[in-house]
Amino acid sequence: MGTWLDVLYLWNTERKMKKTTEFEPVTMDRQLGRTLLVLLLCRIGNGACPYKCQCFTELQVLCADERMSTLPRVSTQVREVIIMTSSLAYLFSHSLMESPQLTKLIFLNNALRSIHLSSFEHLTELQELEISGNPLLDHLYLGTFSKQEKLTKLLLNYNSLKTILPGLFDPLTQLEVLQMKSNVLSDLPPFLFRNLSSLRVLDLSQNRIQEVTGETFSGLASLEILKLGNNLIVNLTSDTFRNTSQLTELHLEWNGIAQLDDGVFSALANLSVLNLRGNRLTAFTDKVFGGEPTNLQELNLKGNRLTELSLESLSSLTDLTLSNNQLSSLTENLFRNLTYLESLDLSDNQLTSLPEGIFKDLLSIEAINLHNNTLTELDSKLFQDQILLKRLYLSDNQLEMLRLGLFDHFILRPTVRLHGNPWRCECQLWYLHDWLMQNLQHVELSDLVACERPDSLRKRTLVSISRDQLVCHRIPEPNSCSLQMSNGTVVVRCSVEKCSPLTVKVQFQEENEAPALSDIPSSSLNVFASKPLTASLGGLD
């Protein structure tokens, strides 16, 4: 809002701080006070500041009075006027007639209901205009901006605009920024922006727009940022963005998009940021860009219903968000060619395991988020190529132990989250325990890394127990035997854990004869005898 408002803000902040620090020197407070005094003297000397307004410079006027219902008269020297939180309800044809010199005019959080189509007729020098925060303003007349050929910035946010008439923006050939965020627009006339060849930023987010086509964005040859988030868009075609080839950012979050056709973004060769968060996508493939390599750097697919992915041609990606989907498995080559990727978010999915080489091409990765999946184990070589990793989140999974060497590949010591897993605090956890004790300062919420088993250590934090308490109680494997027959020879192999002496009883039976039992003493357990008989294993003690 200008340097004089910055001074006012700093002075007010400083005063509040002084009240809480009784013994703090007041040198800075006095200096700011002197500065304000000089500015106020300038204001008094000017003598032209409207009643209940602030004029800290001769060029700027700020009026914020809830009782103000008409526009104040300002000096011909004033270039910027800001009207805030007033009761101003109407702008008439003569309201601004005496201020043709204005270059900046802002109406913020007022009670505007209607603006006469000639209200701005005399403001031919206007470069920036904002009319925002007027919940009763639901329309603009055709011709409202007919004389604003020099306007570069128009903000119409947080009103109740229901529709925009065709031709309303036609005179604004120098416009660079147009915002109509948080209105109730449901339909955009074709060719609405046809004369806005200089427009770089268009914000239509938080409306009720259901459809956008190639004709919607006709004429926007210079558009770089397009925001369509929080609307009701369900369908996009390859024709939709054919007139916006210079786009670098496209925001489509929180719509109802369930499917993206191949080539839908093929015209957007310069796109670096694509936000599709909170839609209904079940699959996403790089074919949406026509299968060609792209310059895309940030892709946000959080909060969809994804079960299938293909990202091979997105080799320029640096930030990939896949959290809060329905991914249960990933192919080993999913991230192939993503050598520039720095941040990968796979949290809040249904992953139970990860292929050993899934991250092998992620040589630049700095952050991997696997929080809140159902991972039960991780291969010891899973992160062997991620030597630059700075953050690794493994919290809230189903991990009971970590394999030896899992964290040994990192050059840096990454910040790690391990809490929320059912750690089995036995000898298999020696590696994690030792690593944790040596890197405690790099483990976030380490006091929540707790044992689930055995019962004697349940809910004990891993940092509170010693290595000697991580004991394995050996459980004998079930008795097992195998039988092989080759060329009339029967071989029986048994693995039995019992104390000596041990006698094995084997029952042999020849054809048409009664079974015969043979005893094999423990001293002969590793000796195999063969007989040219038809044999069956009759009993084993």
Model region roles, listed by residue range:
Residues 2-4, 8-14, 18-541:
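Extracellular leucine-rich repeat
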